[in-house]
Amino acid sequence: MKKLFLGALLLVFAGVMAACGSNNGAESGKKEIVVAATKTPHAEILKEAEPLLKEKGYTLKVKVLSDYKMYNKALADKEVDANYFQHIPYLEQEMKENTDYKLVNAGAVHLEPFGIYSKTYKSLKDLPDGATIILTNNVAEQGRMLAMLENAGLITLDSKVETVDATLKDIKKNPKNLEFKKVAPELTAKAYENKEGDAVFINVNYAIQNKLNPKKDAIEVESTKNNPYANIIAVRKGEEDSAKIKALMEVLHSKKIKDFIEKKYDGAVLPVSE
């Protein structure tokens, strides 16, 4: 009787262990990539990448957050595997402000040329003296916006400062006495619709969400030549060569994704493979 009881007990124990082993195997075999991304165009591009990643054995989960400042924090706090919303100058600025962030660029995916929009004027040269220019309060973006104004001959920046690092305080000449107003990036399209400024800088993602195409609607579009503002996949330092991140980048640099970007955004968003 004792032998029968002991045998039954061993069988139950073996069954429990087998079940545990099976669960652990399923968990360890789970191949999921979690990416925090802004809605347009980033999350849309990732959605197109989802079936391609599935072919490689990965499930893609995309998290759209409500504030730019949340994306790198979520990545640093290991809430996500990667984020997709920023360019390198912005990432570098974020890490200057948050020294505990140890994040790196895993690769560029696309470029969003900045556009300047106006309800009143057809070109930057038409802006009158004292015109109000609305730009974003994102310090890492100011250099690229000011470069557009300098290229149009409206201002002169301090030659000792790298353009990518320039801010409003680096304006040395402003012959038209342009006035500058800073607003959050997500409010620029609204400022344009409400005619709050004579000219308004709008990030492409917010332009697209508000049915604006920089190629067709902007009075000036940022040059893509030697442009350092390509949007990247950012990851934690040391994870850029992990299998899941390599798979993600391979898919995002694939011809199918390149063709999708070119067709869907009609020049407002340009694919990059580097």
Curated annotation (Swiss-Prot):
Induction: Repressed by methionine via the S-box system. A lipid is attached at C20 (S-diacylglycerol cysteine). GO terms for biological process: amino acid transport. Keywords: Amino-acid transport, Cell membrane, Lipoprotein, Membrane, Palmitate, Signal, Transport. Residues 1-19 form the signal peptide. InterPro entries: Lipoprotein_NlpA. It is a lipid-anchor. SUPFAM superfamilies: Periplasmic binding protein-like II. It holds the Pfam family Lipoprotein_9. A lipid is attached at C20 (N-palmitoyl cysteine). It is found in: Cell membrane. One of its GO terms (cellular component) is plasma membrane. Its main location: membrane. The complex is composed of two ATP-binding proteins (MetN), two transmembrane proteins (MetP) and a solute-binding protein (metQ). Part of the ABC transporter complex MetNPQ involved in methionine import. Binds the methionine and transfers it to the membrane-bound permease. It has also been shown to be involved in methionine sulfoxide transport. This is Methionine-binding lipoprotein MetQ. It comes from Bacillus subtilis (strain 168). The gene is metQ.
